[in-house]
Each structure stands twice: as structure tokens, then as C-alpha cells.
Regions:
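Catalytic cores of the polymerase beta-like nucleotidyltransferase superfamily
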Residues: 1-288
Length: 288
């Protein structure tokens, strides 16, 4: 659609999406608010300017924008505006994936996200598959990957791929959606954390503690506080050290991971001499 420029400020404001955005200020005339946007802000109301069906038909993304404003600001969507959003929700299928993703990630990180998702589930589901049971995502950190994982469940990665989300968000969402409970045993718990790496283990522990209270975050924090090695970058040896032992190719990574898991489990100390001694034993066993 082409954009026509108008000189009349009121005519311009009449084309805005919501009354809260249809306010202007003139140094000579002061506040220009023909649609009572200031009153709606005061009362916490999201209301379409004029005919809601017309506004949403002009750009269906406005439907998600209404939900996003309600989520972020904690506002209520005015009944007629909400009704039009439900009736025209299928128009969202024609909106580009990138624009939809941009709105959804802001919506999911809003202070009232859980309430908005529950109320307007049918609208969101047009472009984003939702799990049967959605947890209170407002208890999670403001992390789009975590929140998409929580609301989409096993479909998180596919949903984000369809929305053309960035690879990092897709990968992290898949990690959260597919994460399993941490082992109860201390040794197994340490190894599981090391397999994930410190950063991922800390994030997953927070995620699981919110959705399935396990006290995993406290356990991870204790390991970190006590200096337990949970990632290769904190291991006292590196690839060059292992290469010096005659190891080549993928075997270098295998040996390093073996040392990492042993150090995390407490089987050996994270000291260069001890690790190299253990590495030599591992290398000798591989040669036999």
C-alpha cells in the first residue's frame, strides 16, 4: 500500500494504530489528542483509533502490537479492539515472519506475558504453536529463548525456524526445551553440568527450577563457588598440551572431555600435572 502524506495533524493521527499513539504536541497549540489517548493511557487501555477492523486490515501486525503493548505495559485491550483482533487473526498469516518474530519476542518478555498468552492464545497460535500447558513464564528471566521454549515446548525450534529467528535463539530454545532433569547423585550431577558447560548449565538450572522446582540452580552455584571445573576454558590443560602427547584430530577433543568430566566429578584435581598424568594414561589405553 502507498503512503499518502497529509498536512492536517488530526488527519494524520486518525491513521495511527492505537489511541495511545495518536497524540501530538505543538509549541503553539499544545497537546493535540483528538482520540482521548491520554485518558486511555491513564486508564491503562489499548484501543484502536476509529474502526478496529479497518486498522487491523490495514496492517495485521497491529493485532500482535496490541497484544505486545498489553503484555509490556500491563494494559487491558478494549473489548471492541479485542473482538476485531480475534475475528481478523488469520490475516497474520500474510505478515512476514521477521515482523512477527520481532513482536512475539517482546510480547513474551513483557511483565504481563502469561496473562496475555492465556487470554489471546488463539491469536498467537496462528503464527506460533503453543504447548498444551503453558507455565507462568513471567517467573523466568527476560530471555526470549527461554520463554519461547516454555510456551512452545517440543516445537520451540521448529516454531523459531518458521519465524526466521536468529540461529543463536533457535539453538538455545532447543536446548531448554529438550533439557532433562539433572541427576540426583552428586558425581553424576557434576558430570552432567560439565557436559553442558558452565554457562549452559547455569541457564538450564534456572529454567528447570522455575518450571519444575529442583533446586538445580543452587547446586550449580555451589559447584561454581567451590571452583569446580565445568568447562574446557577453565581446564588447566588445553589442546596444545594434548597434541604434545602425540594425540591428533578428533582424539584431542575426546581426551580433553574425558579430563573435564574427571575433574568435574572430583576424580582428579584440576591441576596441570595431574591432568597430564591422567591424559598419558588415557592415551596409552587408546594405543592398546
Amino acid at each position: 500500500q502507498s503512503v499518502c502524506f497529509v498536512e492536517d495533524i488530526k488527519a494524520d493521527l486518525a491513521r495511527r494504530d492505537f489511541t495511545v499513539n495518536a497524540i501530538a504536541y505543538s509549541p503553539t497549540r499544545g497537546m493535540i489528542d483528538p482520540f482521548s489517548g491520554a485518558e486511555d493511557i491513564k486508564n491503562g487501555i489499548i484501543r484502536a483509533v476509529g474502526n478496529a477492523h479497518k486498522r487491523f486490515s490495514e496492517d495485521a501486525l497491529r493485532i500482535l502490537r496490541a497484544l505486545r503493548f498489553a503484555s509490556v505495559l500491563g494494559f487491558e485491550i478494549e473489548p471492541e479492539t479485542a473482538r476485531a483482533a480475534f475475528e481478523l487473526r488469520e490475516k497474520l498469516t500474510a505478515v512476514s515472519a521477521e515482523r512477527v518474530f520481532s513482536e512475539l519476542k517482546k510480547l513474551l518478555c513483557g511483565a504481563a506475558a502469561y496473562d496475555v498468552i492465556c487470554r489471546y492464545r488463539e491469536i498467537i497460535a496462528v503464527r506460533c504453536p503453543l504447548a498444551a500447558d503453558i507455565p507462568d513464564i513471567c517467573r523466568l528471566p527476560h530471555d526470549p529463548a527461554m520463554r519461547f521454549a516454555a510456551v512452545c515446548g517440543a516445537e520451540a525450534e521448529n516454531a523459531l525456524y518458521a519465524l526466521k529467528a536468529d540461529k543463536a535463539t533457535r539453538t538455545r530454545a532447543a536446548l531448554f526445551a529438550g533439557c532433562r532433569p539433572f541427576p540426583a547423585g552428586e558425581r553424576e550431577f557434576r558430570i552432567a553440568a560439565a557436559r553442558l558447560g558452565r554457562e549452559a548449565a547455569e541457564s538450564i538450572a534456572v529454567y528447570r527450577d522455575v518450571l519444575y522446582p529442583e533446586c538445580s540452580a543452587a547446586r550449580i552455584n555451589t559447584l561454581v563457588k567451590n571452583g569446580v571445573c565445568l568447562s574446557l576454558d577453565t581446564l588447566a590443560v588445553n589442546g596444545k598440551d594434548i597434541r604434545a602427547l602425540g594425540v591428533r584430530g578428533a582424539d584431542i577433543g575426546a581426551v580433553l572431555n574425558g579430563l573435564l568430566f574427571a575433574a568435574a566429578a572430583g576424580d582428579i584435581e584440576n591441576k596441570r600435572e595431574d591432568l597430564l598424568r591422567c591424559a598419558k594414561v588415557m592415551v596409552d589405553k587408546r594405543k592398546k
